[in-house]
Amino acid sequence: VFRRFLRICAFYGASPTFIFSSATVANPAEISEQLTGLRVTAVTKSGAPKGRKHVVMMNPDASPSRTAILLLKAALHRGLRTIVYAQSRKMTELIAVWAGSKAGAFANRISAYRAGFLPEERREIEAKLSSGELLAVISTSALELGIDVGDLDLCLLIGYPGTIVAMQQRGGRVGRGGQDSAMILIAGEDALDQYFMRNPEELMNRESEAAVVNPFNPYIMEKHLICAASEMPIKTNEPFMAHPAIRRAVSDAERKGLLFRSADGQTFYSNRKRPQREVDLRGTGVRFSIICSETGKHKGDVDGFRAFRETHPGAVYLHNGETYIVENLDLDTRIVRVRAAEVSYYTKVRASKDTEILEIFDEKPVHGTRVCLGRLKVTDQVNGYDIWHIHPSQKISSVELTLPPNIFETEGLWIDIPIEIQREIESQMYHFMGGIHAIEHAAIGIFPLLVMADRNDLGGISTPYHQQTGGAAVFIYDATPGGSGLSREAFHKAEKLLSHTLNVIDTCGCENGCPSCVYSPKCGAGNKPIDKTAATVILNGILKNRAVPFRAKPVLLENRQSQKDAENTEKYYGVLDVETRRSAEEVGGWHHADRMGISCAVLYDSREDRFFEFLQEDIYDLIKHLRRLEMVVGFNIKKFDYQVLGGCYDFDFSSLPTLDILEHVYQHLNYRLSLDSLAKATLETQKSGDGLLALRLWKQRRIREIIEYCTSDVRITRDLFLYGRKNGYLLFTNKAGNTVRLPVNFNQSPP
């Protein structure tokens, strides 16, 4: 958004000054420069008023949530205005419900607050908190920064929030009026919380982390490039086009039909007038509306990724202390239907994941292994969900689901596991898959110690054999489509990541693994299999070995496809067009094309470089000729010409390998173009007539003239095909009146 704004300002000769503010981030100038592309000067002296702040670290025997509720109850009775931070939306709602049930007279003075609430609901909660009508709020990071919530006294953190910056931001919500305040960190069972409980001085003495941003995230950048082009056409010689990532994103957007390149190749136009309406500044994906089926009221929103995990059919959905059951998840309309219900259980999804390496950015040896950084395609499949009783917490049953996979591209790193170590693990009868699974969990858990991140910002996959790496590997990737820069940062600290992971596992006092070391609350496989001992042996084997075993570089599957496409450039092809005896009106509509009859058909043969003519009685000879071809080319051939032919002869024309130029056009533009309009823009020629002319000629039995007309259409279709195959695009005049390029891939094998 900043760069779009600056681009327009530069066009009009304006040079605005930006003022950025941050209370906590360690690299304010750097992050501001990355956001704007401008040089920034940092002013780091703070003049904010401060009272005394007490910091308490608790490692409770009871669950962190239960401990927080007891502390909140005590705080309410003492009149302390309190904010409680939970780590997830669902936990925020659950704690608000549980706390309200135990708060007695204070029940109506407690509220949940999280993203997904409607804007008016959030504003109402903020106003009540500022006025004192609410004494306590249970929130996610939604109340972490950017909102003034009044003079609060006590901050309860249910679990370490992942970064020092986040902890300072949350703790900074209290004592803003200069009064004494307190922040209590209630440790959870996960690795990072327990690490700081064992090393409290490190938590207190750690500096704020440097913020990480990926200004070239292709998912986000693509949307803003389309907006930029609609605001002002993009020129290829603009300064920002010098960056390879931007050039690549523009090229991808052109290929998808989101940007149109001018005929001379120097300017890009947006495919829409107002693409800004479809851009969500708060997320990268689509959003689903949550509607109460009983009242029709809009209860909130959820992003596309969370929709599968939090609002699948049968899920328990919590909203502002109220419980709903999800009745339906409609992927076409992006609407989630829920109904109010009082239940004593909650739901947790079960999922599986797969990954494909698309590109390798970098690689390096780390002790006895190789660590790589690259672009990945992740397939996340929700398979079902488990139903858990709230009190006591125990699984009641499991339900299977049939949902489409969530597929996205992102950035990630992966650690090769040497085959020698795998053989050693298996010879000692340890569970190898359980070992690398444990490493994946522990590494993600300790990840925020090295990079400013939350474990929810990451995903992981461990596999005993990956087809592309040729062996076992542990993948850790950015959970944000396109990548957020976290894996890139961690790649440079790979040695520390491995050593810290080993330290967390080694120093945990449990015997077989626990949430403090190798269990993950996010695991879609229910933390099975897990082998803590195997993980220790694997990591020790890697860190004590300096010789990196040889393994071939991963095979990139897209390269195989490009080689295959290159082989298709010299296919034996024919170009076909058919003229009819009767019009659509005469046979009752276009859907009755099989009743139109054939006045003539013309086929161009690329091997013989000549045109062949066929009448209706020659249809069998035409089919024999078509079957010899490696590819049949036409314009609207699948929905029209083949239908006409099928009405005259019983043959499955869909079995022929066919390239339909109009089909390519529609897939790219989502609307149709005429053969004549493409010929005028691309070839600077035009059709010799139209279909109505051919029908008049048939009624007059002027067959030779029909054949000449049909041959002219075949010649135009052939020349469009050859132009597109050579140049990778056709030309057309868009709705704004600009002659622009339409990308095509006529070298790809037809289905």
Predicted regions and their residues:
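Short cysteine clusters
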Residues: C510-C517
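Short His-Asn-centered micro-motif
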Residues: S139, I158, N320, T379, ...
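Helicase motor core with emphasis on the C-terminal RecA-like subdomain
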Residues: V1-I234, E238-P275, G283-G285, T295
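Extended Lys/Arg-rich polyanion-binding regions
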Residues: S181-M183, E189-R206, H224-P239, S251-D252, ...
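Acidic, low-complexity intrinsically disordered tails
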Residues: N540-E567
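Conserved DEDDh/DEDDy metal-dependent 3′-5′ exonuclease domain
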Residues: L603-S677
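Conserved RNase H-like, two-metal-ion catalytic cores of nucleic-acid enzymes
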Residues: E558-M631
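Acidic, Mg2+-coordinating catalytic module of metal-dependent nucleases/exonucleases
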Residues: L683-L742
